[in-house]
Amino acid sequence: MAVALGCAIQASLNQGSVFQEYDTDCEVFRQRFRQFQYREAAGPHEAFNKLWELCCQWLKPKMRSKEQILELLVLEQFLTILPTEIETWVREHCPENRERVVSLIEDLQRELEIPEQQVDMHDMLLEELAPVGTAHIPPTMHLESPALQVMGPAQEAPVAEAWIPQAGPPELNYGATGECQNFLDPGYPLPKLDMNFSLENREEPWVKELQDSKEMKQLLDSKIGFEIGIENEEDTSKQKKMETMYPFIVTLEGNALQGPILQKDYVQLENQWETPPEDLQTDLAKLVDQQNPTLGETPENSNLEEPLNPKPHKKKSPGEKPHRCPQCGKCFARKSQLTGHQRIHSGEEPHKCPECGKRFLRSSDLYRHQRLHTGERPYECTVCKKRFTRRSHLIGHQRTHSEEETYKCLECGKSFCHGSSLKRHLKTHTGEKPHRCHNCGKSFSRLTALTLHQRTHTEERPFKCNYCGKSFRQRPSLVIHLRIHTGEKPYKCTHCSKSFRQRAGLIMHQVTHFRGLI
């Protein structure tokens, strides 16, 4: 049947013209969503957000309705329960709805002449023999007969006699011991099955009936089913197949005898599960550590049976600054602030002005700088209606109206509105000039003065006029030059109403009014 199914699938694939083209993105996103592991994320929040993103990429809730999403989920589950070869064949055609899936499978069944609800004989046989509580053996599991591993004088004995031990419970070697053990282990210690039985069990009447039954003959003749521990050669007789299958039949009988005992113990343990654990967070931490050993290495001498006590999330106290700069030791309350501060040490200036090419450490600095190009002055004085590009400039200006001068020089008694102005003034008393030019050795009391001076050595002129292309070393020079193009004359004489572009021109003009008075 497997050969016929494979040939039919290959023939259908060769007739690919009857199917429409499909989009593979949906299948890719579905596989990413289903195969995502917790250890791929840095924490629970990132893992949940990643799953949410993958699920939205797969189901596309903004484009699909609720009914379409439900149909997509049911379609996925339906394909999962199909046989492997049929599931692969259907997925390759990527049907767009459930009607297409059903029609594809019906066409394949009609081509193979298979009944709609065909049940494999070996599955039906296991369901009849295995009572409630016994382990279900997957049909694709490889059974290796222990008779092939017996060494010594007992090799010449029949297969069934050589396999059954003289004392102690028999060990089932299915080739997948870990899977069977995980299936039987519910998390609590289960009693060992007393599967010791004698050779007289072979004379049970149901065994004889099973050997002579039509279903057993079909199972032995079929190439689909269990892979017995010996190779099925073409010239192997039915009698040899029966001898090989016989230990498996006896094993089923032993499991059937122990089924009620296993079920009784399971019910007793199930009653103990009604009380939930006291600390669910501890159990969750255990589960995460067991499933994700790569997240944290456990010391070799540690006791794994000791309960884990995860540290609770520690709240930040007001004023706490846990993020410290390794270069200068300065601390910050947020990691983003530390990242911006570290750019000072590295010299990185990622934010570039598209107008003049000047670079800045922070985006806020770039935003304030761009106001110079746009002429935006969002801060307005309520007294004189003068506007400023920065709020700090507005606050300093408002002190001139209130005559508030909080910063006073102790040397000469002069007061200032800004602390920075007082600091610059104090340098006139001390004669301090900490900023020195490395080219000519000249010193300056202010850093801005040194910056302007250094442009004389480099001939840098960063301030360019957009009208005529002329460049200037200082921004005030550019502002005065722009008044030539705009015709602006902000300085007005109070005597004759004449206006001037520069304050120096107004002062020289006012001298003409006072000459007659002198």
Swiss-Prot record:
Compartments, as annotated in UniProt: Nucleus
GO terms assigned for molecular function: DNA-binding transcription factor activity, RNA polymerase II-specific; RNA polymerase II cis-regulatory region sequence-specific DNA binding; sequence-specific double-stranded DNA binding; zinc ion binding
GO cellular component, one term: nucleus
Keywords of the record: DNA-binding, Metal-binding, Nucleus, Repeat, Transcription, Transcription regulation, Zinc, Zinc-finger
SMART domains documented for this protein: SCAN, ZnF_C2H2
Function: May be involved in transcriptional regulation.
Zinc finger (C2H2-type): 323-345, 351-373, 379-401, 407-429, 435-457, 463-485, 491-513
Biased composition (Polar residues): 292-304
Species, as recorded: Homo sapiens
Name of the featured protein: Zinc finger protein 449
Transmembrane spans: none
UniProt xrefs under SUPFAM superfamilies: beta-beta-alpha zinc fingers (SSF57667), Retrovirus capsid dimerization domain-like (SSF47353)
Domain SCAN box: 30-112
Pfam family, one: zf-C2H2
UniProt record similarity statement: Belongs to the krueppel C2H2-type zinc-finger protein family.
InterPro entries found in the cross-reference section: SCAN_dom (IPR003309), SCAN_sf (IPR038269), Znf_C2H2_sf (IPR036236), Znf_C2H2_type (IPR013087)
Annotated stretches, region: Disordered: 292-325
GO biological process: regulation of transcription by RNA polymerase II; spermatogonial cell division
PANTHER family xref list: ZINC FINGER AND SCAN DOMAIN-CONTAINING, ZINC FINGER PROTEIN 449
